């Protein structure tokens, strides 16, 4: 069969029966919007340069040159660090004592020791160091009470040094019959 050429005459086969006519400007606007949406699917290009635009939105109205540094004055003479006063040292010692008393790890280890558990060498050393520091801080702050051992030594009767004659007299007066059963 031979091929038929399409004709351009109206009313030819395959041609729509009615034509839809649109306003040209409306069609142009719709087409541009579709094209715009299609173009802007990804991220914006030029990530290096976008920082300047973001800074202008957030920053002040004055444009700053990033090459200029800080205007803060730097002292040319180094002043020695000031020493803490007695009250400041005492306050810091109180704070350190408070921290040590509230130390969760130390409290857990002390509870384990009280329950009769033996700690490893490292943990025992940690506990000893912390307790020594607590004792040192308490004595520094004047919170440490005298220990019981010191009280016993003070309560012991004080004996006068006795001469040899007194000791010999006690020995001679000693009665062995009192101890026989």
UniProtKB/Swiss-Prot annotation:
Residues 32-43 have a biased composition (Basic residues). The keyword Transcription does not apply. InterPro entries: YihI. One of its GO terms (biological process) is ribosome biogenesis. A GTPase-activating protein (GAP) that modifies Der/EngA GTPase function. May play a role in ribosome biogenesis. Interacts with Der. Belongs to the YihI family. This is Der GTPase-activating protein YihI. It comes from Vibrio vulnificus (strain CMCP6). The lineage of its organism: Bacteria, Pseudomonadati, Pseudomonadota, Gammaproteobacteria, Vibrionales.
């Amino acid at each position: 069969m031979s091929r038929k050429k399409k004709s351009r005459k109206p009313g030819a086969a395959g041609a729509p029966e009615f034509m839809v006519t649109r306003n040209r400007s409306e069609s142009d606007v719709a087409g541009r919007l579709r094209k715009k949406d299609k173009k802007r699917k990804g991220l914006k290009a030029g990530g290096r340069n976008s920082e300047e635009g973001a800074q202008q939105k957030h920053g002040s109205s004055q444009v700053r040159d990033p090459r200029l540094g800080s205007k803060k004055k730097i002292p040319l003479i180094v002043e020695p660090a000031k020493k803490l006063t007695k009250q400041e040292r005492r306050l810091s010692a109180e704070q350190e004592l408070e921290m040590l008393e509230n130390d969760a790890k130390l409290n857990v280890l002390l509870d384990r020791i009280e329950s009769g558990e033996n700690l490893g060498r490292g943990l025992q050393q940690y506990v000893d160091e912390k307790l020594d520091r607590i004792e040192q801080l308490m004595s520094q702050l004047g919170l440490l009470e005298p220990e019981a051992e010191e009280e016993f030594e003070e309560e012991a009767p004080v004996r006068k040094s006795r001469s040899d004659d007194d000791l010999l007299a006690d020995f001679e007066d000693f009665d062995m019959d009192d101890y026989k059963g």
